[in-house]
Amino acid sequence: MLNKEVYVNRRRKLKENFKDGLILIMGNDFSPLDCEDNTYPFIQDATFRYYFGIDHNGLIGIIDIDKNEEIIFGNDYTMSDIIWMGKQKFLKELAIEVEIEKFIEKEELKKYLENRKNIRFTNQYKTDNIMYLSSILNINPFEFDKNISFDLVKAIIKQRNIKDKIEIEEIEKAVNITKEMHLSAMRNVKAGMKEYELVADVEKQPRKYNAYYSFQTILSKNGQILHNHSHLNILKDGDLVLLDCGALSDEGYCGDVYKRQLLCSIER
């Protein structure tokens, strides 16, 4: 996480846009790959992380303007979790690190929101978040987008569009890792290899920095096909190899660089 004052100031600035009501910001949960306990790598919602900083699943942030308080709702670690995962810092401790004094179990959120007016939230891209919010707010999930706060969406976009020095440094870190991904491809590409062999080398680079890739790597000799995620072709001399890739840093900032390279073997 960044310095706690960063998150305090971001929340304060967002709150200044509204005179009453409350702001609800959804974090992400795990997404199952083929069963509940086998999941895709966890990626926290960028807006939740921007204001609350915690890279953990199942959290919801509340900025309550009427009551002048800030809360994180979630399910803290149980003894069963500790047996499986080892000793962990409790989520209520992480909340304090971003200057949130109140951490409340997630099951209490619906009661907290009862009879409240001006509950502001943004559009959601994950179905489980749509269904959860629809349930606790008693709205039709098929009409979810009719209930979002466009004033909140605009305020968040306006604030997040302006990058401070700390964010620029984090973006540069992600771009530098992305640079290594491209340089590795340039050094290791050779005629006769499969595209997926080069993809494996490219995607290895961010893992060396506790990073991930910011989107599915596009690497293809058939660059005329937009967003080609197949990597089964054999590379040959004279191919124009397209690489579009990026790194997602451990602080949640991304790189995204695109290039084409002529494959030309040189005898030494």
Which role fits each region the language model picked out?
Residues 1-179:
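A composition/biophysics-driven feature that prefers long, compositionally simple stretches
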Residues 163-187, 193-210:
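Active-site pocket-lining segments that scaffold enzyme catalytic pockets across diverse folds
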